[in-house]
């Protein structure tokens, strides 16, 4: 409803686009409420606003589907991708758009001119494209997306089993991604950092954003690897709790 309010205050015709992550990743695996993205699509259509999905994190299987757009059944006008596009081997970013935007770019170009000038220093590197194509072949050959989808329920069950730990405030998860909020320590960010260190010493590494632990296992994991991750998370968080009492 915030977008609708902004449209009412400033005019939808003055808003070019709305960009969102299907699931906010680095801010703590924030899963949208049911129907949220569908409502966003409706508002954008109503006011002629382009809907952009940032699928840098959710793209290429992280949600259990190839893209978050497919998982939630919402089609954006523009989609951005990176990271898993090349499996991180070579940095690469990709932008996909619908036919309306594509045709607008192509038709607006003078005859004989480059349709979309994007010849920047780090753009269009052939080795990145080659890496992306090779990775896509592996995704298909090894059925990576279905592996992730099938493993996701087991991972989520293990993730939420940590809810009984005293220092854990909240847990969120979807597909092969999860966020564990730690209870506030003396100042914001301290609990997350101290818990990150304790878990690292226990043998598991992840990203901590503020007081949230971001857990995103590899798709090639097996159940035994998920068990190991959860066990070491429990050990690390428990050790963190003990250190706080000393």
List each model region and its residues:
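Conserved N-terminal phosphate-binding loop of PLP-dependent enzymes in the Aspartate aminotransferase
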Residues: 1-246
């Amino acid at each position: 409803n915030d977008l609708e309010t902004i449209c009412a205050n400033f005019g939808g015709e003055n808003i070019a686009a709305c960009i969102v992550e299907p699931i906010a990743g680095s801010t703590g695996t924030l899963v949208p409420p049911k129907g949220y993205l569908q409502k966003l699509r409706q508002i954008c259509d109503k006011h002629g606003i382009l809907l952009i999905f940032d699928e840098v994190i959710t793209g290429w299987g992280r949600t259990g589907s190839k893209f978050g757009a497919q998982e939630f059944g919402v089609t954006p006008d523009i989609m951005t991708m990176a990271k898993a596009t090349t499996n991180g081997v070579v940095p690469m970013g990709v932008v996909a758009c619908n036919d309306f935007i594509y045709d607008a770019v192509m038709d607006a170009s003078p005859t004989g001119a480059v349709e979309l000038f994007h010849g920047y220093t780090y753009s269009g590197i052939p080795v990145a494209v080659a890496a992306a194509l090779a990775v896509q072949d592996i995704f298909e050959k090894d059925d990576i997306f279905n592996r992730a989808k099938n493993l996701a329920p087991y991972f989520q069950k293990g993730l939420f089993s940590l809810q009984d730990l005293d220092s854990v405030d909240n847990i969120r998860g979807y597909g092969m991604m999860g966020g564990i909020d730690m209870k506030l320590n003396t100042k914001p960010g301290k609990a997350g950092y101290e818990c990150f260190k304790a878990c690292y010493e226990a043998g598991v590494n992840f990203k901590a954003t503020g007081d949230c632990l971001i857990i995103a296992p590899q798709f090639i994991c097996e159940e035994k690897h998920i068990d190991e991750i959860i066990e070491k998370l429990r050990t690390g968080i428990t050790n963190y709790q003990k250190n706080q009492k000393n």
